[in-house]
């Protein structure tokens, strides 16, 4: 009926918002297996804070591919 059509229309908008929030940087991939990153993977790596610094920081990001 009409109710089903309304549900279909609102879903893509929610998905779009979720995808945008999923690409934000994060400090950890923990607790994401059933959350934002699914069905994508969350990847972490270390990188130096700046070119003339040896200090490293951990960066994590959901990969949408």
From Swiss-Prot:
Disulfide pattern: 22-37, 29-42, 36-62, 44-60
Tissue expression profile of the protein: Expressed by the venom gland.
GO cellular component, one term: extracellular region
Domain of life: Eukaryota
Keywords assigned by UniProt, alphabetized: Calcium channel impairing toxin, Disulfide bond, Ion channel impairing toxin, Knottin, Neurotoxin, Secreted, Toxin, Voltage-gated calcium channel impairing toxin
GO MF annotation terms: calcium channel regulator activity; toxin activity
Chief place where the protein resides: secreted
Propeptide positions: 1-18
The keyword Metal-binding is annotated on this UniProt entry: no
UniProt-annotated location(s): Secreted
Domain notes: The presence of a 'disulfide through disulfide knot' structurally defines this protein as a knottin.
Further comment found in the protein's record: According to the nomenclature proposed by King and colleagues (2008), 'Gsp(267)' comes from the species name 'Geolycosa sp (strain A267TDLS2-KZARNA)'. This species has been reclassified since that study, as indicated in the work of Oparin and colleagues (2016).
Protein's job: Modulates Cav2.1/CACNA1A voltage-gated calcium channels (P/Q-type currents) in rat cerebellar Purkinje cells and hippocampal CA1-CA3 neurons. At saturating concentrations (>10 nM) decelerates activation kinetics and slightly increases peak amplitude without affecting deactivation kinetics. In vivo, does not cause death when intravenously injected into mice. In rat models, through its activity on Cav2.1/CACNA1A, has an ameliorative effect on memory defects provoked by hyperstimulation of N-methyl-D-aspartate receptors (NMDARs) in the hippocampus.
Family: Belongs to the neurotoxin omega-lctx family.
Protein name, UniProt field: Omega-lycotoxin-Am1f
């Amino acid at each position: 009926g009409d109710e089903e059509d309304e549900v279909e229309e609102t879903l893509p908008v929610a998905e779009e918002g979720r995808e945008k929030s999923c690409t934000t940087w994060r400090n950890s991939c923990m607790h994401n297996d059933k959350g934002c990153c699914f069905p994508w993977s969350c990847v972490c790596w270390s990188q130096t804070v700046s070119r003339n610094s040896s200090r490293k920081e951990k960066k994590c990001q959901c990969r949408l591919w």
